[in-house]
A protein has these predicted regions:
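Active-site neighborhoods and metal-handling regions in enzymes and metal-associated proteins
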Residues: 1-287
Length: 287
């Protein structure tokens, strides 16, 4: 390993520590302002795309990274608990998004993993609705997808609440999504095909008649970025390995009606898994 600080010259370091007769591996996201000087200096006998090797290495979090992501998720749990106190009739989605940013600052988080998502009622049917001036009213579902960073590492969690009252239809959709989330999480263990996790969750939702309303993959990998290389989907050819951290986030989105998503981050351990989020997933009606 070679360690350096941001005050060191990366160019001098590369020239000093590399074999100029061998190609130099670079990442696909390497900024041109770093790559072009390397080319000018002929710091290698050519360049190769090393993105896959780097992505695979980043997909396995070491002990320190795991602890940082536990802390980020703990802050996210606290923020979710705090923001529910602001669920009042007439509040807008953008009001809540701005309030959440203040909560994160007060908790000491570094910043946002992504712009927070608040969606009331039928707005939640889009799955990834951008907060607007829609006002909260009784009978609405409230889909909340939020994440903060701690020392550069991301958290991500989704919960869905109901305001003032909940119908039998809303309860059925919620419990269907919750079961899909919980059963997929229970199945996480080293060696399981990631496609199998998607199949478990999707099968539960399909059996209840909502298969066509589950419109995205089950999950994504996460770390220094909110969405990293690797996904939990029917198309994935990968298997879970210890150190992987990914989301499990089934959802049902019913146009002009409602949307429900329940999301946790899950760490693959040597003998099973650890759920990084601890905020309640019980069906919750906010009075």
């Amino acid at each position: 390993k070679v360690r350096f600080t941001d005050s060191d010259s990366y160019m001098d370091l590369v020239i000093k520590t590399t074999d100029h007769t061998e190609p130099l591996g670079i990442d696909k996201k390497m900024p041109a302002r770093f790559l072009l000087p390397l080319i000018d200096q002929k710091a290698a006998s050519g360049f190769v795309n090393a993105s896959l090797a780097l992505d695979q290495a980043r997909a396995v979090k070491d002990i320190q990274e795991q602890e940082l992501m536990r802390k980020a998720s703990h802050l996210n749990d606290m923020a979710m608990a705090e923001i529910t106190h602001f669920f009042k009739e007439g509040v807008t989605e953008t009001d809540l998004a701005e309030q959440l940013k203040k909560i994160y600052r007060d908790l000491g988080a570094d910043g946002l993993s992504f712009e927070p998502l608040f969606a009331f009622g039928s707005n939640a049917a889009s799955g990834h609705h951008w907060p607007d001036d829609t006002r909260l009213k009784p009978g609405d579902c409230i889909l909340v997808d939020i994440g903060c960073t701690w020392e550069g590492y991301c958290s991500d969690m989704t919960r869905t609440f109901f305001y003032k009252n909940v119908t039998q239809h809303q309860q059925e959709v919620y419990h269907t999504v919750l079961k899909a989330n919980e059963e997929a999480e229970k199945a996480v263990t080293p060696g399981i095909p990631l496609s199998s996790l998607d199949q478990i969750a999707r099968g539960i939702i399909t059996d209840k008649g909502y298969g066509s309303a589950f419109t995205h993959r089950l999950g994504h990998f996460i770390g220094l970025e909110d969405h990293e290389f690797g996904d939990v989907s029917s198309a994935s050819a990968d298997r879970a390995v210890p150190g992987n951290i990914f989301s499990i986030e089934p959802g049902v989105y019913l146009e002009n009606d409602m949307g429900v998503r329940v999301e946790d981050l899950v760490l693959v351990t040597d003998h099973g898994h650890e759920i990084l989020n601890h905020f309640s997933k019980e069906l919750t009606v906010i009075d």
